[in-house]
Amino acid sequence: MQRFIKWLAVITSLDLLIVLLGGALVTKTGSGQGCGKSWPLCNGEFVPSNLSMETIIELSHRLTSGSAGILVTLLCILSWKYYKHVRETKTLAILSFVFLVAQALMGAAAVVWGQMPAVLAIHFGISLISFASVILLTCLIFEIDQKFDARSLIMDKKMKFHIYGVTIYSYIVVYTGALVRHERASLACPDFPLCSKNRPMPTQLHEWVQMGHRVAAMLIFAWILYAMILAIRHYKQQPVVYWGWIISFILVTLQAVVGVLVVFTNASLAMALLHSLFISCLFAVLCYLVMLGTRSKVNAKEAASTSKQTK
């Protein structure tokens, strides 16, 4: 059964990643109304008779979301049953399921009633939490923490501050990026790093949205760089923290490069999807570091208790 659960965890993680990228594809191609205002049917039909490209994209996104719902539910039930001895399993299972249902309902509401861009931008963030929760469940199932000896990990307050702070802030950056997509502001500023050669500062809403995201992205790049330097200096003996921050910096660098290329490639579809891919992976890595941070407190208490008993 454990072999089956491992395969299920991998497939579920990939399916949720496809859901995330599919949502970005729907937004990028303007396919949100590809099935009209009907849900769960498509243009009032179980199998649509007229298959435009927008309809195919929207219908494919709905199908992958539906399959993800089934897979996540099954994974939550099995992990709850067979891995309940792991402290985080129940919490992650609940988060995976609840946020997947929330994003599905929000997606359906957007189709039927429509939503403002500021509300639609939350949709991607909700999906991201479900994805990260499933990734963490997968790590627990594959016992990644044991392989890196994470159960004995103890971090200082400074490192935990950076882990929690960067993760929370990254969610804000994700929201600003999703808002750029939903406000159709990807090309509002044709130059980089300033808005344009003639107008370095933004003058209207779409430009403010775009520049706000750029500033937020620059700050998270600098923050992760600083945290990585701390990890390299002080956590070489803790490979999970050491490599966690190095991988985070690689991902945020790729994210930044692709973000610039989005501007200079006229917001090409490939760059837009890569932009969503890298931030999804980055958020998952940061969430894993958060899980390690919560364990660190427990590990420190256990170490202190053991030390007292020894004395």
From Swiss-Prot:
Cofactor names: heme b
Spans through the membrane: 7-27, 63-83, 92-112, 122-142, 160-180, 212-232, 244-264, 272-292
Keyword hit for Iron: yes
Annotated residues for binding of heme o: H61, H123
Keywords for the protein's UniProt record, in alphabetical order: Cell membrane, Disulfide bond, Heme biosynthesis, Iron, Membrane, Metal-binding, Oxidoreductase, Transmembrane, Transmembrane helix
One BP annotation, GO: heme A biosynthetic process
GO molecular function: metal ion binding; oxidoreductase activity, acting on NAD(P)H, heme protein as acceptor
Pathway where this protein functions: Porphyrin-containing compound metabolism; heme A biosynthesis; heme A from heme O: step 1/1
Amino acids binding heme b: H213, H275
Family named by the database record: Belongs to the COX15/CtaA family. Type 1 subfamily.
Function: Catalyzes the conversion of heme O to heme A by two successive hydroxylations of the methyl group at C8. The first hydroxylation forms heme I, the second hydroxylation results in an unstable dihydroxymethyl group, which spontaneously dehydrates, resulting in the formyl group of heme A.
Protein name, per record: Heme A synthase
Source organism of this protein record: Bacillus cereus (strain B4264)
Phylogenetic lineage: Bacteria, Bacillati, Bacillota, Bacilli, Bacillales
Primary gene name: ctaA
